[in-house]
A protein has these predicted regions:
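Conserved P-loop
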Residues: 2-79
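Conserved RecA-like P-loop NTPase ATPase core
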Residues: 13, 86, 130
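Fold-independent oxyanion-binding glycine-rich loops
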Residues: 7-8, 35, 88-90, 118-120
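Hydrophobic "anchor" residues on beta-strands that sit immediately upstream
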Residues: 84-85, 114
């Protein structure tokens, strides 16, 4: 199952983490990977998840170093044994650090898992794979 929370409204990450907490409470294992965020968010200290931490000091304009981290994160995700995989802000690395084809391949690799994805951008071909899509909008 693939769930997507997208848009420019607040609450995408909170919703994804809430889903992860419910899954953890039901005995599932959860992996969290946060893209384009540093690893200083306060919730990371208390979440009972497997967390693939982003670089501590994310540069304003990430480049080759960040690309290497993204590549290692994708490998970690593909090899994860977790039941639930949260890809926070993943939509925003598609077409910059991950090609659309590679992102679709990733979803195919995870077809036996529940995947929760957040980000700002709407990507039609990617969204076609989703079971649930929630558009969060500032009003």
């Amino acid at each position: 199952m693939i769930q997507i929370y997208f848009g420019y409204g607040k609450g995408k990450t909170t919703s994804a983490l809430g889903q992860g907490m419910r899954a953890k409470g039901a005995g599932k294992n959860v992996l969290l990977v946060q893209f384009l965020k540093n690893n200083k968010s306060s919730e990371l200290a208390v979440l009972p998840f497997d967390i693939f931490k982003s670089p501590e000091n994310l540069p304003f304009n990430p480049g080759k170093e960040y690309q290497a981290w993204v590549d290692s994160a994708l490998s970690y995700i593909k090899n994860s044994t977790c039941d639930i995989i949260i890809l926070d802000e993943f939509l925003d690395v598609i077409d910059t650090f991950v090609s659309l084809n590679d992102s679709l391949d990733l979803l195919n690799c995870l077809k036996d898992k529940e995947v929760i994805i957040t980000g700002h951008k709407k990507i039609d071909k990617f969204f076609e794979k989703a079971d649930y899509i929630t558009h969060m909008e500032k009003v």
